């Protein structure tokens, strides 16, 4: 139909008004599609999710919005007196931090509101909350994507619901919830890009990275703390399975570095050093020269193992060591785990031992030091590291005392068999330690890993000895259980507990008559058939007892 465009022409020649005007002829040209478009939700996307959520929240009655009050931290008094104020408080909480401190309760409340609104606030029109589910899900998925990226960057496979993934690192630590909720916002190429992806809008000005960096640091702390606890549990399990021996280590939960002999290859003044911050040892960069800090354990309780079978672990703290650049090759760092260290290392430094070096361009390789000279052996393998990585170096396996293994977070990375017996072994090589090296990088240093825990255990895979006990005086070889499991702390007390003195006295005449020149007090050797066969020579003054 047609209609006059000039209001003065709206009166026809017959004096009557002509009806119809505007884009839709005052409604006379509406179609079904046009009307549906007025009430249909647009597709929910990452860009419009929060806006649509706000739009639909504005449709809810005040009573429904007040149900959010207890789930929003630090809401302003009076904010929930009006619909507009309540919605603004809810949206501010979402945009300031995409996870409420009580996110689980928030999700539960919304699900009840969406699925059974009458249970929450009584009967209300379903049309008021249509579309809220899609908007909420998109916001939820956006957050979950970011959380998954963060977990994967830390080497953790995301599983379960969003809140499960955030709290997946620990069910035991109550403070993890706050740290994980805060840290979940922290991964994107830049803070500006992240802010835009999360809120669906470009920030008016550049956002500071300080806040997300701090919260990511909290999550890194949580990860390393969990790994430290896992390493300690593994140490206790190893100790239990190996029927005793030495089991110890250091969690560095103090502000001083005691129980260690510390040596710096380039001095500790002006060239970097390790500092205890109360939870870990952290490298402090100074100058631009390479420097290596070597730690040898001196705590009497665990400075040496009882056997040649050793297992040492090291847990990376919240600071991940710098990787060397490929071109030009500069900077970087390394961390070494040391076993079978010479007994006089606290006096002269490490002259002998076996190590694994982790660092450089994300590599790891086993090596040994003999008379002060380092030799790398086996193959170099790819090896990354990060906050909470657990590395272990095992000296001696079920296949022999000359076998070595390196593992990361459980799986074995590298092995070496010292078939030529080129590394040192024996009672004078049972100390252990670790080291961190900062390499020079232009005007600075490549910061090495911080260390939050180290552990040591006897790792005899047989769970039995095989050494010899000289019951006449000193201990020639030491069983995994101190003094042969007698409960004694000296050889003399062990003889008394075993009744050896009486036994020797009773059998002395027989011994003299059987073998001329046999000492009055013989030696007793106990071991397996295989260990007995492996003995190159047999001493006529030793009594050999084979257990199997």
Swiss-Prot record:
Pfam family, one: DUF7257
Protein's name according to its UniProt entry: Gene 31 protein
Protein species of origin: Mycobacterium phage L5
């Amino acid at each position: 139909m047609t209609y006059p465009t000039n209001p003065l022409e709206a009166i026809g020649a017959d004096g009557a008004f002509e009806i119809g005007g505007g884009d839709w002829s005052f409604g006379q040209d509406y179609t079904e599609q046009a009307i549906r478009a007025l009430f249909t939700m647009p597709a929910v996307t990452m860009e419009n999710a929060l806006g649509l959520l706000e739009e639909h929240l504005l449709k809810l009655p005040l009573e429904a919005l007040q149900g959010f009050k207890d789930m929003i931290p630090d809401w302003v008094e009076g904010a929930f007196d009006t619909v507009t104020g309540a919605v603004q408080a809810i949206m501010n909480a979402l945009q300031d931090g995409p996870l409420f401190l009580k996110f689980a309760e928030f999700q539960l409340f919304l699900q009840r509101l969406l699925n059974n609104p009458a249970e929450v606030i009584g009967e209300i029109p379903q049309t008021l909350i249509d579309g809220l589910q899609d908007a909420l899900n998109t916001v939820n998925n956006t957050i979950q994507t970011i959380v998954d990226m963060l977990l994967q960057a830390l080497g953790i496979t995301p599983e379960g619901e969003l809140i499960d993934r955030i709290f997946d690192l620990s069910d035991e630590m109550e403070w993890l919830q706050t740290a994980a909720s805060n840290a979940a916002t922290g991964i994107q190429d830049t803070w500006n890009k992240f802010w835009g992806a999360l809120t669906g809008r470009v920030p008016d000005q550049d956002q500071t990275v300080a806040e997300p960096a701090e919260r990511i640091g909290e999550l890194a702390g949580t990860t390393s703390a969990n790994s430290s606890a896992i390493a300690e549990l593994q140490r206790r399990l190893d100790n239990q399975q190996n029927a005793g021996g030495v089991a110890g280590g250091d969690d560095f939960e103090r502000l001083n570095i005691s129980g260690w002999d510390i040596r710096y290859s380039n001095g500790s003044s002006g060239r970097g050093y390790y500092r205890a911050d109360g939870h870990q040892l952290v490298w402090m960069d100074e100058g631009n020269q390479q420097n290596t800090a070597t730690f040898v354990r001196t705590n009497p309780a665990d400075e040496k193992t009882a056997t040649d079978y050793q297992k040492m672990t090291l847990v990376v703290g919240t600071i991940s060591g710098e990787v060397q650049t490929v071109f030009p090759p500069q900077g970087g760092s390394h961390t070494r785990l040391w076993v079978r260290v010479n007994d006089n290392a606290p006096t002269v430094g490490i002259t002998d031992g076996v190590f694994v070096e982790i660092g450089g361009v994300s590599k790891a390789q086993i090596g040994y030091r003999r008379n002060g000279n380092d030799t790398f052996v086996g193959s170099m393998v790819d090896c990354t590291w990060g906050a909470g990585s657990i590395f272990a170096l095992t000296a001696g396996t079920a296949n022999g005392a000359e076998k070595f293994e390196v593992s990361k977070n459980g799986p074995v990375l590298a092995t070496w068999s010292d078939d030529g017996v080129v590394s040192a072994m024996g009672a004078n090589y049972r100390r252990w330690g670790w080291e961190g090296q900062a390499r020079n990088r232009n005007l600075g240093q490549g910061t090495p890993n911080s260390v939050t825990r180290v552990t040591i255990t006897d790792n005899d895979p047989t769970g039995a000895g095989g050494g010899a006990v000289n019951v006449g005086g000193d201990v020639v070889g030491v069983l995994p259980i101190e003094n042969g499991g007698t409960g004694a702390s000296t050889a003399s007390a062990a003889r008394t507990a075993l009744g050896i003195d009486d036994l020797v006295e009773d059998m002395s005449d027989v011994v003299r008559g059987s073998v001329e020149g046999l000492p009055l007090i013989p030696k007793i050797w106990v071991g397996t058939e295989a260990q007995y066969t492996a003995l190159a020579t047999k001493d006529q003054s030793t009594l050999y007892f084979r257990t199997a």
